[in-house]
C-alpha cells in the first residue's frame, strides 16, 4: 500500500511498524496534488481544507480522526513595517499575497480576518503563486496569479504587496506579524469558536481501503501517538476533534468554497 506521511514524533513508530510503502517526500504538502489529482496513495497525510475541497469535488477519500499537524495561524500574516502602519481591519483594497488561495493556512487566515476583524474578503486583492491542490477549484475574481519566478517575500519587501501569509515570518528586519499579539488573538479565537486548535494536516485513506484495514492503521497511529507522549496539539478521535473539525468546516463554507456545511460524521463515512 503506497503512503504519504511526514516525519513527526506522532508518526515515528507508525512509520517503523506499519509496513506501508512510504513515498520519499520530505515536505508532504509538495505531494498533495499527487494525492487528490493522481490518486497515487491509498493512505496519505492531507491538509484539512484540501480534504474538504476534495470531498466537495467527489474525490474518493475518507478521513481518519488523527491530527498530525496543527497550529494557530494568527502569526503567519505579515506586513512590511518600513512602509508605515497597517492593521488587519485596513486590508480592504490592499494586496495580500499567499502561496495558493485554497491552501489551509490561507483559508484559516481569511476566516480570522472576516470573523475577528470584520474584513470584507471580496474587497481584498489576493495575490497567489501556485495552482490549487484540487484541480477543479477556481480562485475568486479578486485573486490574481503571479507568473513563475515571482517570490512572495521579495514582493512584500519591495512594497509590491501590502501583506502576505508566510509559513514562517522572519524574526528580524522590517517584516512583522500584522496581528500584533498572535498568541492572545489565538486565545480569543479559541474562546469564540470553542475549538481547541486550528487543524492543519490529518490523514485520509482511499475509499477502496477496507474498514478493517483503515481501523488497523488508525489503531497503530494511536499507538504511535501514545509512544510520543500523546501531545495535546495532535488530538486523535472523532469526539476529541468534533469542534476542531466543525470550526474548519465553518471557515471554508463561510467563504463559499464548499457547497454546503458537511457534518463531522460525513467526513468519516
Label each PLM-derived region with a short phrase:
Residues 2, 7-119, 126-133:
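Short, glycine-/small- and polar/acidic-enriched structural segments
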Residues 23-37, 86, 124-157, 240, ...:
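Short helix-initiation/N-cap motifs at beta->coil->alpha
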Residues 55, 156-160, 249, 253:
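Alpha-helix C-terminal capping/helix-coil junction sites
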Residues 141-228:
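Pocket-lining segment of extracytoplasmic ligand-binding domains
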Residues 198-200, 257-269:
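Conserved C-terminal helix/tail region of periplasmic/extracytoplasmic solute-binding proteins
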Residues 204, 209-259:
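Secondary-structure end/capping motifs
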Amino acid at each position: 500500500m503506497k503512503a504519504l506521511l511526514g516525519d513527526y514524533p506522532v508518526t515515528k513508530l507508525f512509520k517503523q511498524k506499519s509496513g506501508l510503502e512510504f513515498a520519499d517526500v520530505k515536505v508532504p504538502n509538495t505531494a498533495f496534488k499527487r494525492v487528490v489529482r493522481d490518486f497515487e496513495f491509498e493512505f496519505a497525510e492531507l491538509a484539512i481544507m484540501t480534504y474538504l475541497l476534495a470531498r466537495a469535488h467527489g474525490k474518493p477519500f475518507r478521513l481518519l480522526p488523527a491530527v498530525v499537524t496543527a497550529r494557530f495561524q494568527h502569526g503567519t500574516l505579515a506586513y512590511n513595517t518600513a512602509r508605515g502602519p497597517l492593521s488587519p481591519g485596513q486590508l480592504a483594497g490592499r494586496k495580500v499575497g499567499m502561496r495558493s488561495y485554497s491552501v489551509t493556512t490561507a483559508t484559516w487566515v481569511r476566516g480570522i480576518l472576516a470573523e475577528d476583524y470584520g474584513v470584507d474578503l471580496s474587497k481584498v486583492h489576493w495575490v497567489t503563486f501556485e495552482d490549487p491542490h484540487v484541480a477543479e477549484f477556481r480562485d475568486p475574481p479578486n485573486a490574481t496569479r503571479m507568473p513563475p519566478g515571482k517570490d512572495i517575500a521579495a514582493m512584500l519587501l519591495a512594497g509590491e504587496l501590502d501583506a502576505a501569509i508566510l509559513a514562517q515570518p522572519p524574526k528580524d528586519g522590517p517584516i512583522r506579524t500584522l496581528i500584533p499579539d498572535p498568541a492572545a488573538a489565538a486565545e480569543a479565537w479559541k474562546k469564540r469558536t470553542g475549538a481547541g486548535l486550528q487543524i492543519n494536516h490529518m490523514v485520509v485513506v482511499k475509499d477502496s481501503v477496507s474498514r478493517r484495514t483503515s481501523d488497523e492503521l488508525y489503531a497503530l497511529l494511536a499507538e504511535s501517538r501514545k509512544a510520543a507522549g500523546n501531545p495535546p496539539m495532535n488530538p486523535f478521535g472523532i469526539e476529541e476533534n468534533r469542534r476542531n473539525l466543525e470550526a474548519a468546516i465553518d471557515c471554508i463554507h463561510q467563504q463559499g468554497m464548499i457547497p454546503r456545511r458537511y457534518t463531522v460524521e460525513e467526513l468519516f463515512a
